[in-house]
Amino acid sequence: MSMFRLPVIYTCFPGGKHKVLTMSYDDGRQEDYRLVELFNKYGIKGTFNLNAGIDWDDKRIPLNEYRTVYAGHEVACHTYTHPTIARCPLEQVAQQILADRRGLEDLIGRPVRGLAYPNGSYSKDIIAMLPSLGIRHARVVPTTGHFGMPENFLEWAGTCHHNGQLMEKGRAFAELFKTQYLYMMYVWGHSYEFTDRDNWHVMEEFCQFIGGR
């Protein structure tokens, strides 16, 4: 019996990588200016989950600045006006997501395909209709503490909130070496929390440690 080689093909992240880091930040607050600057400084990419229907809050970045401020990062939906959608009729939920998606696409000039559930609120019925609304991934509030890929990209739990042992998680992620597995570190939060807690140094230290790898 003759032997022959069977090729082994692995799914990889872009560039053939087996590990990736992503950051997910909600609400488009003024502190995003500083957060985006940090990400850009250390070569880190993030997703910013925004509301195209909130143009009256001076704590938020003006809508007409979205295209420039978030250039180079993903922009995703956070619904049009941030209602607690599990309490809303499904028709209204669809309107909230579609209006936000279309509004954001007009503002930034590129496709919007992600969602972060506002107030962490969602239901199985909402999940089921997301593909018909053009949404391919959606983040929830609970976290996993690990670096595996999600079973359902429309109910995507991140690794940790940035107040949840961020540096400890970052060091553990950096030490992962088995290339036969896919690993993702997924951090989420709100940029204003750094101001509220006076702990911007937490993100600065993390970005400096993890960036450029």
Task: Give a label for each model feature.
Residues 10, 34-38, 65, 125-129, ...:
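A short acidic, amphipathic alpha-helical/loop segment
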Residues 22-25, 76:
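Generic enzyme active-site microenvironment
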